[in-house]
Amino acid sequence: MSNIPEKRPSEQPDEAEAKKPHIEPRHDHFAKGIAPIKAEFIVENPDVPVEEKYINDDEAEGGDRQEEEGGKGGKNKKRRGQNKKRDLKQQHEEVRLCSSLLDPENPKECRFGAENCRNSHNVEEYISSKPEDIEGNCPVYTAIGYCPAGLKCRWLHSHYNKETHKLLKDLEQVENAKALNNYEVNKITPDKKTSLQKKKYTFEYASQMIPYLDSLVQNEANIEKAQEQAKENQSTFVEAPFKVAEKKKLNLRDAKIVSPLTTVGNLPYRRLMKTLGADVTYSEMALSVPLLQGTNAEWALPKAHRTEYPGYGVQIATSKHWAAAKAAEAIYKEATHVSELNLNCGCPIDLLYRQGQGSALMEQPARLLRILKGMNASSGDIPVTVKIRTGTKENKNTAKALVERILSENEVAAITLHGRSRQQRYTKEADWSYVQDVANIVQDWNNKKEDNKELRDTQPTCFVGNGDVYTHEDWYNAVNIPGVDSVMVARGALIKPWIFEEVEAQQYLDKSSTERLEMIGQYAKFAIEHWGSDEYGVGLARRFMCEFLGFTHRYIPVGILERLPPKLNQRPPQWKGRDELETLLGSTDYKDWIKITEMFLGKAGPNFQFVPKHKSNAYEKS
């Protein structure tokens, strides 16, 4: 990884000590679990109870999967849960222009014909029906020198000559964008997607491996015995086409890692995090079966910005070894910019758990090992990694035994452990003492590999900790645990996107409201570049900006805290900022989040709807 210091701060005590921030003396008048905000910034007689301020942090791990998967029961199936009214449908234009006429100078042939097409072929009528353009220059045109949205662009005035009826193109900027790696990668071609949909895709690696994995199912209680039986029957035994030593090298030592995050961990967010110092990013969780069905929504998830690679991982969830093997092969062949393939064994969402995916795999180690074996054999030179929790039940940790089994199979390049059980969720702090115990197991395994002639040449298994990292002190305390190579940051990087800048500076950065707004503006530009500058793209960008602001508004400026360090699980009383903008950025009212989006995306249309996810269980119980 680039820009990673050779020595950690703890190895240079004098220097690190000098850089530590001044810690105010502790005051006991704050109730347990309440953020210690200075008295002059606390709002008297608040209109919002403390308990009702925030969305559920479990949603960052499962996001809209619960809504999407739960909606497969037909049109009239009742919506369940606290947020029955959460409707994410976005608005469309009153008059829809046929896509064949996006560029009036170079029209394409409409496959339906002008008379039969349900969209308009009258350019003048379309332009006159459009709402007033958004002020400023088109973010897409500014970034890449042309605008694929053409006449549909909401900033059309900035790249359209009304007199000549021509769209403008900046050829110099087109070349600059390529030189600056300003483009997206891992896009599956339409013909490959069609072959998946028609079940005609060729899985040369997975098809060899699946019969071998099937043979292991016969005796899951004793995998070693099953392997011996399979070897005796040469007709069913297949050697894995790739071994761990033949994979790309994966070095996560001291890397600044952003956790896989569903919904909020989208491409614009990850791209923003790369500009703020992140070394490693991950896709949103993709489900293996929809990938194999060639669905557009699922294949949108492995897409990445070119600046994310190297250091970009694709995360998948599955419950079947055949699906895992095939999905791994498809990603290897169709997504050319992937540094690692991560198996999600930590998602706590009930729906996936009931389907045997996510954290449910921790309860079925034999199935988990088969899945990892299938992925490893079918993913070409892409190393396979796994993300787990301490266990599925509270006060019953199982990760130690599971990690020992995973290591013995030698199928993964890295293991990430979230210091919580599935049942515990976010009501208590992560158990870093248990993370340390598991780190010792991985460290011992790596030491044994050094003494083993057969395994000596293979890469050591990286171990990454995860849970409640919100400050540079949290980060360094974690990476200085023996055996912990690095830390994966989730909520901390959503609430405070500049966390890695603080890690680099080894101090708290009291960002002004203006600086924070600039970051949000950068996100808006990246969002428009990704989703498009037409009405639909702007609606998507606005919706995901609101999801993002649903986390960033939780940041409490360090300058208004009575003592440090801040903690993720502390609930703040209602507070006001040092200026109006800071107060607005900390607002818990989603209508204020929409106002913030309007600073960059223009006025929200009357049909735009956004309802935040349901209340949170993310805070310590007082």
Swiss-Prot record:
GO molecular function: flavin adenine dinucleotide binding; mRNA dihydrouridine synthase activity; RNA binding; tRNA-dihydrouridine47 synthase activity; zinc ion binding
Biological process, per Gene Ontology: mRNA processing
Enzyme class of the recorded protein, top EC level: oxidoreductase
Amino acid composition bias (Basic residues), ranges on this chain: 74-83
Catalysed reaction, written as an equation: 5,6-dihydrouridine(47) in tRNA + NAD(+) = uridine(47) in tRNA + NADH + H(+); 5,6-dihydrouridine(47) in tRNA + NADP(+) = uridine(47) in tRNA + NADPH + H(+); a 5,6-dihydrouridine in mRNA + NAD(+) = a uridine in mRNA + NADH + H(+); a 5,6-dihydrouridine in mRNA + NADP(+) = a uridine in mRNA + NADPH + H(+)
Active site: 347
Stretches the record annotates as Disordered: 1-92
Sites where the protein binds FMN: 260-262, 315, 387, 418, 466-468, 490-491
One GO cellular component term: nuclear periphery
Biased composition (Basic and acidic residues): 1-31, 50-72
Obligatory cofactor(s): FMN
One Pfam family this sequence matches: Dus
Compartments reported by the entry: Cytoplasm; Nucleus
E.C. numbers: 1.3.1.89, 1.3.1.-
Zinc finger regions, C3H1-type: 93-124, 137-160
Keywords in alphabetical order: Cytoplasm, Flavoprotein, FMN, Metal-binding, mRNA processing, NAD, NADP, Nucleus, Oxidoreductase, Repeat, tRNA processing, Zinc, Zinc-finger
Name this protein carries in UniProt: tRNA-dihydrouridine(47) synthase [NAD(P)(+)]
Organism: Debaryomyces hansenii (strain ATCC 36239 / CBS 767 / BCRC 21394 / JCM 1990 / NBRC 0083 / IGC 2968)
